[in-house]
């Protein structure tokens, strides 16, 4: 009779109903980099008073970030999920801006941090996502997959036998 079952690696597709033998840790920060939560313009909030026109100097798209640092009075067109350029601290939403020949006009002043998702604000590297002893359901499988694990350590399933001996069960 074993009181503690040994651990074994279990693939994602076989996890439902299993018991975690170890804590599941985040393998990286999520989001992995500071990015925009909205389509709009990345800028320095202090430069964007309502009515102010900023120089439009480029674009930052998912997978193709704007490389140079943003200077005072500059803005960069940005897509949702795209990396924030260095020096930017806010997003001016498309609906709060007007693109003009001389640049982009702020129709409303964004606050510092507006519509910005910071690196690691959801999950930090090494953060415990699921605890040892937890029974895995579909939600937990999604957490494991989202954390980048293909397999996790689970307690081996117990083997149970029923032995019949005459009229009694042992």
Residue ranges, per PLM feature:
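Short, glycine/charged-enriched hinge/interface segments at domain edges or termini
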Residues: 42-170
